[in-house]
């Protein structure tokens, strides 16, 4: 099949997107498809209409690729694509909607979820620029359970751009100012410590299944932008090392199952399809969900590739399956 790989784009994640696209193209060739590389620009519609691909794979990271923009356009053009639909992408892209979707899923099913998420608040830039919200920064310590340190992050940005750990009021002010340069909405929430994990998922609905959780260990500092972009500054353990979860093997296995269940709850709550990743932290008592990715990188040094390898799956085989679906 002729598959258009949409890559590049103009977001802060352009370079990562190009690397992801090249990996996907190589995998498609190995799976005996005919890939067409398209660097997303103002000529995209004309290029797609001229190329007439059988389907598309969105490899654009960040805005446009993960917020439903490209997916909506492909819907309008009548071109099938791999992964979740445009409405799902729009919901997933906004991290501030996580708790609402999870609560709705819990109410619908009548069951208590095992997934949890950090408590916090979301503010628009207008509140700080025009309504004087900086004058209430001192209240965050009391309003968010546990107080400092606090996590500050743009609501709709990836690769941890604009994410900060604020240890006091002054750091919080600086973190807010920086985060607002990336997005008009910013989240301030509990800072969660623990085992950092990513659970990649294949399939849709009740047929979706989790691949082995990948443990993420930065060699220095936090797993923020530099660590996510540099393959030589972070180690992936797939599956997660049991000793990282508990010294007792049976307890660790039970925790791993709970982590996988939590990721699947989030995936299904948003109505995701095809493939995706759920990033979370095991804090020693529960799985704290941080964010969801509808277009995870398939680059050679990525959590998705690590999870596939741990499952005995090849990226070409996974892509072939996604295209056929």
Task: Please give the residue ranges for each predicted region.
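Phosphate-binding site of ATP-dependent enzymes
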Residues: 167-254, 258-261, 282, 288
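Hydrophobic beta-strand scaffold residues
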Residues: 35, 80-81, 117, 150, ...
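A short glycine-rich, hydrophobically flanked beta-strand micro-motif that places a catalytic Asp/Glu
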Residues: 36-41, 186, 190, 197-198, ...
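Active-site nucleotide/adenylate-binding loops and adjacent lid/helix of ATP-dependent enzymes
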Residues: 1-7, 48, 91-194
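ATP-dependent carboxylate activation and anion-phosphoryl transfer catalytic cores
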Residues: 248-325
């Amino acid at each position: 099949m002729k598959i258009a790989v949409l890559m590049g784009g103009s977001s802060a994640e352009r370079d990562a997107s190009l690397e992801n696209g090249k990996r996907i193209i190589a995998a498609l060739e190995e799976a005996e498809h005919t890939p067409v590389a398209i660097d997303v620009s103002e000529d995209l519609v004309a290029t797609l209409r001229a190329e007439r691909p059988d389907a598309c794979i969105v490899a654009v990271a960040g805005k446009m690729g993960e917020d439903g923009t490209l997916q909506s356009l492909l819907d309008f053009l009548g071109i099938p694509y791999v992964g979740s639909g445009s409405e799902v992408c729009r919901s997933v892209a906004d991290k501030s909607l996580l708790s609402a979707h999870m609560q709705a899923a819990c109410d619908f099913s009548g069951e208590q979820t095992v997934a949890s998420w950090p408590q916090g608040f979301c503010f628009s830039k207008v509140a700080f620029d025009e309504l004087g919200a900086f004058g209430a920064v001192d209240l965050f310590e009391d309003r968010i359970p546990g107080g400092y340190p606090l996590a500050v992050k743009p609501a709709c940005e990836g690769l941890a751009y604009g994410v900060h750990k604020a240890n006091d009021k002054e750091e919080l002010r600086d973190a807010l100012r920086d985060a607002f340069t990336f997005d008009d909405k910013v989240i301030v929430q509990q800072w969660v410590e623990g085992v950092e994990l990513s659970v990649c998922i294949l399939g849709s609905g009740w047929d979706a299944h989790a691949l082995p959780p990948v443990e993420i260990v930065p060699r220095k500092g936090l797993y923020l932008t530099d660590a996510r972009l540099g393959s030589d500054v972070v180690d992936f353990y797939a599956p997660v090392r049991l000793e990282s979860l508990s010294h007792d093997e049976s307890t660790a296995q039970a925790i791993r199952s709970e982590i996988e269940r939590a990721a699947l709850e989030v995936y299904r709550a948003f109505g995701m399809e095809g493939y995706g990743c759920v990033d979370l932290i095991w804090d020693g008592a529960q799985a704290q969900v941080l964010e969801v990715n509808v277009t995870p990188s398939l680059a050679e040094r990525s959590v998705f590739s690590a999870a596939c390898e741990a499952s005995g799956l090849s990226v070409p085989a996974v892509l072939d399956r996604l295209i056929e679906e």
